[in-house]
Amino acid sequence: MPGNSRRRGAVRKSGTKKGAGVGSGGQRRRGLEGRGPTPPAHLRPHHPAAKRARAQPRRPVKRADETETVLGRNPVLECLRAGVPATALYVALGTEADERLTECVARAADSGIAIVELLRADLDRMTANHLHQGIALQVPPYNYAHPDDLLAAALDQPPALLVALDNLSDPRNLGAIVRSVAAFGGHGVLIPQRRSASVTAVAWRTSAGAAARIPVARATNLTRTLKGWADRGVRVIGLDAGGGTALDDVDGTDSLVVVVGSEGKGLSRLVRQNCDEVVSIPMAAQAESLNASVAAGVVLAAIARQRRRPREPREQTQNRMI
């Protein structure tokens, strides 16, 4: 009987799939065994899709310290009102004027910013065809201070009060913290060079001009910089909801650096280990943790209140209670 494997001389073929291993269509199943799934077309070197992908020009990665271009009438006007340093204001020819555009041009002229009129097509190319509403503001890279210079300037006005940001990613939080540092008598802000928000036009606007007065320094290694500051007599206090020291028990009259963690993960392990103490803000039981910039403002306000009325030595306080 055809197909009967029990007949004399019959040989059972290996494999579970039906059909010939070699046949019309060039399947050759045995040759493909163990090679895994077929990769996507753009990853196969000789496929037309891969050739097209290689032919496309690669977009350069924007560095954080490059010149920034702010687009749109409202963002440009907010930057000019906040005193964000700028080098040029670009206005497309034929753009319909309104109150915002008129104010932008007037403020740029008053601030000595170059006003450049250009064709809309040229502005499209300059902004990579992003929506610009006929106006763009060129903002130069921020001039960061050196961590050693920042500390030296703070120690010249004792007691020093500095804020370090441990991988904070939102530039609006950075700007808000710079504003709080200026409001409560701080001397500067320290940020990591990598994986951190930088002083962009967004941070400038949020700081409401405080970024022009409060220096910001960048550290190649935040943990190492904090260790160096501690060796020079500055007490490092971390800010975390699970901290073992309540804010009410912190002596804010010493030279301090307040370390604020990132929005999601808080303080990193190495930074936390190098803090002299980790401080928490007492809150109502039903309240959740505070935003990073809000928490920094609360701590800075508490420290400023103590410095306006320095705490009495503990021995005097105990004697008065007796």
From Swiss-Prot:
| One of the record's GO molecular function terms | RNA binding
Comp. bias (Basic residues): 1-16, 43-61
What keyword terms does UniProt attach to this protein? Methyltransferase, S-adenosyl-L-methionine, Transferase
- Region (Disordered) spans which residues? 1-69
Which biological process annotations from GO are given for this protein? methylation; RNA processing
Q: Which residues bind S-adenosyl-L-methionine?
A: G261, I281, L290
InterPro entries, alphabetized? Alpha/beta_knot_MTases, Ribosomal_eL30-like_sf, rRNA_MeTrfase_TrmH, SpoU_MeTrfase, SpoU_subst-bd, tRNA_m1G_MTases_N
Naming one, the record's GO cellular component terms include:
cytosol
EC number(s) on file: 2.1.1.-
Pfam families registered for this protein in UniProt: SpoU_methylase, SpoU_sub_bind
Give the family this protein belongs to, as stated in its UniProt record. Answer: Belongs to the class IV-like SAM-binding methyltransferase superfamily. RNA methyltransferase TrmH family.
Question: What's the name of the protein?
Answer: Uncharacterized tRNA/rRNA methyltransferase BCG_3644c
